[in-house]
A protein has these predicted regions:
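Conserved catalytic alpha/beta core of Sir2/sirtuin-type deacylases, generalized to analogous enzyme cores
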Residues: 2-14, 19-347
Length: 347
């Protein structure tokens, strides 16, 4: 059974072009060692990916958190310091993710934090054009995207929203916290109001090389302005039906709302897969780890094992694993996704 814990791991970096090599030999190449050889092995794999992409009747992209990280959407470091240094100083957490679980004393503080979190990760584009470059690779193919990411970078890069299935929610949606009903609500307007109430400006200009989002733009701290860590009580979002506080539409527990849009996307994905059964189907997995492997990774392995004309690609620096059972119809590239995509565009 291919779900046994038998995997092949690929190591080595990429720096130049190379000719296509036999997949099975490449999947065992790391037994030989040597940096220059590893470079050639990695680049040969990229050539195979390019070849399979060109030959494919359709492409299914499976995207995890590692893809947005490769695009520059980091939750710590400079981005965190730029937008959350005041929260960090007061509460002691060191990254956005940790702050998202902090038990704030008031809803006014909670939503001050989350309005920043949502805006910089949902309504601003990532610092690099990685998603745009991926779109260039597949825009003329019959494609579908399955993703556990909630930042909507695919749609911002030009991917058809009818070909996207966001399984875990969307930073751009609110829901009732109970929930008392299965509807979600766009939050961009109210998020902007929360930010303005804290003293931020929303500028059309780029800030510190982080390019503005297509819907609206960069978040700026005006000079000589004291940014507030709270919002007015009237800006705390409440359910229009029961009056309870709203929450983010993120799959954190059993209160997650799967609205009509979620089910329509799931149905479109299912039909896409059924319509392409038996065709040359490329499963392109990008930045998927092991937090929720059953959504993308394990399903892609099953399809590769059971569908004769399927081919599986895993690109993920440090986690490019392929089950031995499908090693002859799969390839793993242990390299930064942005580097690989640039190589693919250059071929």
């Amino acid at each position: 059974m291919f779900l046994r814990k038998r995997t092949s791991r690929y190591t080595g970096d990429c720096s130049a072009k190379a000719k296509t090599a036999d997949v099975d030999n490449l999947n065992r190449a790391d037994d030989f060692g040597g940096k220059s050889m590893m470079d050639n092995v990695c680049l040969n794999k990229i050539n195979i990916v390019k070849e399979k992409l060109e030959q494919a009747d359709a492409v299914v992209i499976g995207a995890g958190a590692g893809l947005s990280t490769a695009a520059g959407f980091t939750y710590s470091g400079e981005r965190f310091d730029r937008y959350f240094s005041d929260f960090a100083e007061k509460y002691g957490f060191k990254d956005m993710y940790s702050g998202g679980f902090y038990d704030f004393d008031t809803l006014e503080e909670y939503w001050a934090y989350w309005s920043r979190y949502v805006y910089v990760n949902r309504y601003m584009n990532p610092p690099s054009p990685l998603y745009d470059n991926i779109f260039e690779l597949v825009k003329n193919k019959d494609y579908f995207v399955l993703t556990t990411n909630v930042d909507h970078c695919f749609q911002k890069a030009g991917f058809d929203k009818e070909r996207l299935y966001y399984t875990q929610g969307d930073y751009g949606l609110f829901q009732c916290s109970k929930p008392c009903h299965d509807s979600t609500y766009d939050n961009e307007d109210i998020i902007r109001k929360k930010l303005l109430s804290q003293g931020f400006k929303i500028s059309e200009e780029h800030e510190n090389s982080e390019k503005a989002g297509k819907t609206g733009t960069a978040l700026v701290k005006p000079q000589n302005t004291q940014i507030k860590l709270t919002i007015p009580s009237e800006l705390v979002p409440r359910c229009p039906r029961c009056g309870r506080p709203m929450s983010m539409n993120l799959r954190a527990d059993n209160t997650f709302v799967q609205d009509d849009g979620w089910y329509r996307a799931a149905d479109r994905y299912g039909k896409f897969m059924e319509n392409h059964r038996g065709q040359k189907l490329l499963f392109l997995e990008l930045g998927v780890g092991y937090n929720t492997p059953g959504i993308i990774k394990y399903n892609f392995w099953r399809y590769a094992a059971n569908w004769k004309n399927a081919f599986y690609v895993c690109i993920n620096k440090g986690e490019a694993y392929v089950p031995e059972d499908i090693a002859e119809k799969a390839v793993g590239v242990n390299e930064d996704i942005a580097v690989v995509v640039d190589e693919l565009k250059a071929l």
